[in-house]
């Protein structure tokens, strides 16, 4: 996401993502959560059911500020670090359209594609680690 933009701006453009109707807002906490009934379809559709059950125990509130605060990026910091993106081609939470928009507007050294849901660390951990090892060797 480029300098001065917010995650919420990109989320608003994502008409195919399945999570929005399942967000519960807690204004008093300045936070929101996902309703558990969307976990499987929205985050873990290619994972074993025990992963979804574990998620129900560990996923928690997310601060609203992280999505509405414009990013402040500088060439000295963000611009000096090589960037790589791992596109999850079957992601239903942050759809490929939005992922492509993000990495196109904030160019990367390389884009990797992995045929997974939003959670490749659970569904394809070895393939994800192989990508990390390749990046680390660059």
Label the predicted regions.
Residues 1-36, 66-67, 72:
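Flexible "cap/lid" loop of the alpha/beta hydrolase fold
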Residues 36-38, 113-114:
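Short glycine-enriched loop/turn motifs at secondary-structure junctions
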Residues 36-37, 133-138:
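Plant-biased detector of terminal regions, especially N-terminal secretory signal peptides
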Residues 50-51, 57-121, 125, 137:
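Conserved serine/cysteine hydrolase catalytic core
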Residues 7-13, 99-101, 126-127:
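Short, glycine/charged-enriched secondary-structure capping and boundary segments
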Residues 125-133:
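Short, amphipathic alpha-helical "lid/cap" segments that border enzyme active or binding sites
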Residues 37-46:
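Helix-loop "lid/cap" segments that line or gate small-molecule binding pockets
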Residues 31-37, 50, 82:
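Short, basic/glycine-rich phosphate-binding loops at helix/coil junctions
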């Amino acid at each position: 996401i480029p300098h001065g933009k917010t995650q919420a701006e990109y989320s608003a453009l994502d008409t195919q993502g399945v999570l929005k109707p399942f967000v519960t807002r807690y204004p008093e906490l300045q936070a929101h959560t996902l309703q558990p009934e969307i976990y499987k379809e929205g985050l873990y559709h290619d994972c074993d059911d025990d992963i979804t059950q574990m998620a129900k125990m560990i996923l928690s509130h997310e601060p609203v500020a992280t999505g509405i605060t414009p990013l402040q990026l500088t060439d000295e910091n963000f611009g000096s670090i090589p960037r790589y993106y791992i596109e999850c081609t079957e992601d239903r939470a942050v759809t490929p359209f939005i992922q492509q928009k993000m990495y196109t507007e904030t160019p990367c050294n390389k884009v990797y594609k992995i045929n997974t849901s939003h959670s490749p660390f659970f569904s394809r951990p070895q393939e994800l680690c192989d990508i990390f090892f390749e990046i680390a060797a660059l």
